[in-house]
């Protein structure tokens, strides 16, 4: 099960955070800082899976952004690793070459995409067309 989903830049600034288990608001900042430091401090030759406290971190770097997913110890790491890539491909498809600025200025749309893919910490959809369908409808409604 996915516990949290983060996108952080190379400076360690959180650009997107989504929690699927309750984490006290005061502890979230500390958790995000520790998690981003753990991922940012690793070289590109090191494994993208990290044992961290009572869960695993799976991360992938895309240009200046790191996508980090915290999961319980029973989750399949490779499945989550590919899920991260699928998420970024969906973002690329919608924003045509997604960037950090796209995420910052369209955070609501990024959350809609993530919510279409993950429900209560479980991956429920991976098909790009079905994920983007609600957003495309919203875009058409806002144009008219």
UniProtKB/Swiss-Prot annotation:
GO terms for biological process: intracellular protein transport; vesicle-mediated transport. GO terms for cellular component: AP-4 adaptor complex; trans-Golgi network. Gene3D superfamilies: 3.30.450.60. Keywords: Golgi apparatus, Membrane, Protein transport, Transport. Coiled coil: none annotated. It is a peripheral membrane protein. It holds the Pfam family Clat_adaptor_s. It is found in: Golgi apparatus, trans-Golgi network membrane. Adaptor protein complex 4 (AP-4) is a heterotetramer composed of two large adaptins (epsilon-type subunit AP4E1 and beta-type subunit AP4B1), a medium adaptin (mu-type subunit AP4M1) and a small adaptin (sigma-type AP4S1). Component of the adaptor protein complex 4 (AP-4). Adaptor protein complexes are vesicle coat components involved both in vesicle formation and cargo selection. They control the vesicular transport of proteins in different trafficking pathways. AP-4 forms a non clathrin-associated coat on vesicles departing the trans-Golgi network (TGN) and may be involved in the targeting of proteins from the trans-Golgi network (TGN) to the endosomal-lysosomal system. Belongs to the adaptor complexes small subunit family. This is AP-4 complex subunit sigma-1. The gene is Ap4s1.
């Amino acid at each position: 099960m996915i516990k949290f989903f983060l996108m952080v830049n190379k400076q360690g600034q959180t650009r997107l955070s989504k929690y699927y288990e309750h984490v006290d608001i005061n502890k979230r900042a500390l958790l995000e800082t520790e998690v981003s430091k753990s991922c940012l401090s690793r070289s590109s030759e090191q494994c993208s899976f990290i044992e961290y406290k009572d869960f695993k971190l799976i991360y992938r770097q895309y240009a200046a952004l790191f996508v980090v997913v915290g999961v319980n110890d029973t989750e399949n790491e490779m499945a989550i690793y590919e899920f991260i890539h699928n998420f970024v491909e969906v973002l690329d498809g919608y924003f045509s070459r997604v960037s950090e600025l796209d995420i910052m200025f369209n955070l609501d749309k990024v959350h809609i995409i993530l919510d279409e893919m993950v429900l209560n910490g479980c991956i429920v959809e991976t098909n790009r067309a079905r994920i983007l369908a609600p957003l495309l409808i919203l875009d058409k409604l806002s144009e008219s």
